[in-house]
C-alpha cells in the first residue's frame, strides 16, 4: 500500500488515459438512458486534456498541472502555429472539467453533449495528423 502510483509523463501514458476517457464517453452516449450528458462532457474534456498533454511532451514541453485546454493549446501553439486550428474546440470543451461534474445545477442537453463529443474527436483527429507518434506512428524525435 505504500507504493506511489506511477507518474504519467510519457506520450503513450497520456494517450492511453485519453483513449479510456473517449471510450467511456462513446459507450455512455450510445448505451445509457437517460444520457448522462454532463458525465460524458467531463470525460470528453479529460480525453482532450490528456491528448494535449501527450502532444506537449512530444513537443518538448512539460505539461502544466491544469485542466485548462486553452492554456494547453496556447503552449502547443508556441511550438506549432497549426494548433490555432483547434483553439475554438478547446475553448468549448475546457468548461467541462472538474467543476461541472460535481455541480448539480449544471444541465447539458444531449445535443450540446454530442457537440462536445464531436469537438473532442476533432482535437484527436488533428493530433493524429499533426503528431502521429502520439498514436504510435512515426518517430517521436522527428516531430519537434
Region locations from a protein language model:
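Terminal alpha-helical segments
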Residues: 1-144
Amino acid at each position: 500500500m505504500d507504493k506511489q502510483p506511477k507518474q504519467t509523463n510519457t506520450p503513450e501514458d497520456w494517450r492511453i488515459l485519453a483513449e479510456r476517457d473517449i471510450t467511456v464517453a462513446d459507450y455512455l452516449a450510445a448505451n445509457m438512458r437517460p444520457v448522462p450528458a454532463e458525465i460524458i462532457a467531463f470525460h470528453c474534456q479529460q480525453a482532450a486534456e490528456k491528448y494535449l498533454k501527450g502532444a506537449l511532451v512530444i513537443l518538448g514541453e512539460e505539461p502544466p498541472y491544469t485542466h485548462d485546454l486553452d492554456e494547453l493549446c496556447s503552449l502547443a501553439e508556441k511550438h506549432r502555429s497549426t494548433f490555432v486550428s483547434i483553439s475554438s474546440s478547446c475553448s468549448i470543451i475546457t468548461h467541462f472539467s472538474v467543476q461541472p461534474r460535481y455541480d448539480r445545477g449544471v444541465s447539458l442537453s444531449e445535443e450540446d453533449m454530442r457537440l462536445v463529443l464531436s469537438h473532442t474527436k476533432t482535437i484527436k483527429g488533428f493530433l493524429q495528423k499533426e503528431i502521429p507518434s502520439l498514436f504510435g506512428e512515426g518517430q517521436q524525435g522527428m516531430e519537434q
